[in-house]
Every structure is written in structure tokens, then in C-alpha cells.
Amino acid sequence: MGRLQDRVAVVTGAGEGIGAAIARRFSVEGARVVIAEIDETLGRATAETLAAESGNETRFVPTDVGRKADNEAMIAAAVEAWGRLDVLVNNAWGGGKISRAELKTDALIDDGLAVGFRGPLWAMQAAFPIMKEQGYGRVVNICSLNGVNAHMGTLEYNSAKEALRAATRTAAREWAATGIVCNVICPAAKSAAFHRVMAEHPELIAAADAANPTGRIGDPYDDISPVALFLASDDCRYVTGNTLFVDGGSHINGSAWAPDLPDEP
């Protein structure tokens, strides 16, 4: 029997990268998983692959986490399909652009906050009454070293993820007596977003590996998803409001991330 046997989980941004790795881990550990993903091709493919691999049910729900209605719909889809919701993983991110802080546009900042902060908060608010009624819930928010280490060029991303860390701690405190625990993972992994950024800055790939105390950036499935599994499991019942740095020690002395930033927004 898997560690999440018969549990129901929603994972956002689960079509690729860290989200797909976490969804896969949950599925092989017995969970029924909603793949909440904006890209229909990726989302459907992941749902089908996981169901075939694990034999457990999955459901793809097209989701733009920057829209409140979509966050509510993905939660409702899990309850409609399986009658409960045990685990919520807020992982999705919509992109952003590397540029100087003084050149960030209102639109770029608004988009970053909508996807990186408001979306996860809307999902948590939609999940809360269901988890409270059950007396059981696990919220895992995927944040980032970018905000912790003040990575250059990604102000809207850094700000959204640090706001989400604060919201996670607040929810953990307010919801502690209900059986809901809320925690954060700050990963260092070669995610889909990592590969997209590095495609624009290939010179930083070797530097990113070298800057990590272990000499490498982590793997989403082998390094990140086992920690998400712990935070989603019964074993996490007395752990709440924490940030787990699953990063090979990258947070210890900051980061060498220092790209040459463009002079236009």
C-alpha cells in the first residue's frame, strides 16, 4: 500500500517539470490526482501517462491559475470526481521576464502576482472548507530560492514567491487546529522553467551547477518529489508553517546568479 493510498490530490502546473514529477510520485504512491495545467496537450498527456503507469485514476482539468474561477473549478473537480480533497500542491508559474527592477512594468508585476501569489491563495481558500470538514488537509506551496537569495532580474517572481511563503505561514497558524498543515518547498531543480531560462542564458548552466554545494542542480523526481510526498503524507501531521530548502544547500551562502540584465523592460 502506498503512502497516499486512496488520498485525493490537486497539483497545479503538473504538465511538466516539478509539477509532473510530484504528480507522478503521488500517483505511484496510491493517490488519485487532478492534473491542473494550462497547456492542454501537456496536461492530458501527463494524466494519461500517470494513470497507465500507476493504475490509479487521474483527471486533467484545464487551469489558468491566474484566474480565480479556474482555481475554484479544479478544487471542485477533485471533489466531484472522488468526494474529497486531501492534498493541494501549488506549483504553477506563468513565466515572467528577466529585466531590471527599475524597468519592471505594472503589467508584468500584476501577472507575476496573479499567478505566483493570488492563484495559490485562491486555491487554498477554495480547499479550506473541504479540508476543514474532513479534519484533514495538506497544503504544499512550491516557492523559490530566487526570493530568498534575491536573484537578479526576476523581481515579480521573487516577490510573488516570498508573499506566498508569508501566506503559507499565516494559514498554517490560523488553520493548525483544523487538521490542515501548510508548508513550503524551495527547490533547486532542473525544472521546465529552469530549462527555459537557461535556453536564453546557456552560459549560466555550468555556473548554476558549480554554485550548488553538491556540484549539481537537483532532479525534479528523484530529489524534489520525495519531500513533497512527505509533506503530503500522514507523517507530516506535526510539521506546519515550515520552509524546506530542497536545494543541495544553495540557500546557505546565497547564489552566484548574476546575469547581464538588458537595458529595456
Segments predicted by a language model, with ranges:
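Conserved glycine-rich cofactor-binding loop
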Residues: 8, 15-16
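Residue(s) in the substrate-gating loop at a strand-loop-helix junction
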Residues: 144
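Conserved mid-core segment of classical short-chain dehydrogenase/reductases
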Residues: 72, 95-110, 133, 153-156, ...
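C-terminal substrate-recognition "lid" of short-chain dehydrogenase/reductases
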Residues: 121-124, 136, 217-246, 251-252
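Active-site helix of classical SDR
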Residues: 124, 160, 168
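Short C-terminal tail/terminal secondary-structure segment
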Residues: 98, 240-265
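Alpha-helical segment proximal to the catalytic Tyr-Lys
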Residues: 129, 173-177, 237
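Catalytic Tyr-X3-Lys loop
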Residues: 102-121, 136, 140, 157, ...
